[in-house]
Regions:
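Short, compositionally stereotyped local motifs that mark structural "simplifiers"
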Residues: 85, 91-233, 250-253
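A short beta-strand element within beta-rich, extracytoplasmic domains
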Residues: 240-254
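Surface-exposed turn/loop modules enriched in turn-prone residues
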Residues: 257-258
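Extracellular and analogous surface-interaction loops
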Residues: 231-242
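Substrate-binding groove of N-acetylhexosamine-processing glycoside hydrolases
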Residues: 1-139, 189-203
Length: 258
């Protein structure tokens, strides 16, 4: 089942909706014919469908934002054989389609141009990885708090951070800024980038210097369910004087997140 109700891009930029991501690329890659189907089942498929719920939509423009341009990717799923799909070619047509939507006054999402970040502690430093689902854009970033431009650092690999740092980045195409500015405020303290031992893979988020947003599926929250055992150890790698200890959390009716 395909839903257009989930976040269609990096969640830091998106209006609140249902948890989880379903980007333009995810919809493009969707295949309604399942691998475990018998061969004769494919001929019985009458078409494709995407579901749209409106609990988080307050006006028609909110619906347009969630539907377009992902509806174009769904159409590509419907009329193109899997082996004939070409993401790069689709994106070229997408630019013209977006111009058409703008001319019609349709409030379409530009999420395809926004940056998804990953901040991972490694060897006493933070490695900041920046990605965009569009391979035809360039990413430029700054470390001095100014907004990025074509004259800024061009991103060509993980950025190594070893102190409190503000990283700003955006995508560019043909000399024009395409996506929103990503603003990462990395805070360094005694625990930042230190080795952490625990029982969940994403517990490293506790020492990556970055606070989560209000959207708990933004890939910056470490979550435990009600009956989970919580145990982790941060190795400060030496004797330290601690004057203050703090931890942030949010409570969800179904999950407790720290």
């Amino acid at each position: 089942v395909l839903y257009l109700i989930r976040y269609q891009g990096p969640q830091w930029f998106e209006p609140v909706t249902y948890f989880g991501n379903n980007t333009l690329k995810d919809v493009f890659d969707y295949e309604p014919v399942q691998k475990d189907w018998k061969p004769e089942y494919e001929s019985l498929l009458m078409g494709v469908q995407a579901c749209m719920w409106t609990e988080f939509c307050n006006k028609p423009e909110d619906v347009d934002y969630l539907v377009f341009p992902r509806l174009a990717a769904l159409a590509e799923v419907a009329w193109t054989r899997p082996e004939k799909k070409d993401w790069a070619s689709f994106l070229k047509g997408m630019d013209s389609f977006n111009e058409h939507l703008a001319a019609k006054g349709i409030a379409y999402a530009r999420s395809m141009y926004n940056i998804q970040h990953t901040v991972k502690p490694e060897d006493g430093a933070l490695n900041v990885t920046l990605e965009c689902i569009r391979p035809d854009v360039e990413i430029y970033y700054t470390l001095n708090g100014s907004n990025p431009a074509m004259s800024s650092h061009r991103y060509d690999g993980p950025i190594c951070v070893t102190k409190t740092q503000m990283v700003k980045a955006a995508t560019f195409m043909n000399g024009k800024q395409m996506g929103e500015i990503l603003d990462l405020r990395l805070t360094w303290n005694k625990a930042t980038a230190k080795p952490l031992l625990g029982n969940k893979k994403n517990e490293m988020l506790l020492v990556n210097g970055l606070r989560g947003s209000l959207k708990y599926t933004d890939f910056e929250w470490c979550n435990w369910n009600q009956n989970d055992s919580i145990s982790f150890t941060i190795d400060l790698q030496g004797r330290e004087i601690l004057n203050k200890f703090s931890i942030g959390y949010r409570f969800s009716p179904l999950e407790v997140l720290y």
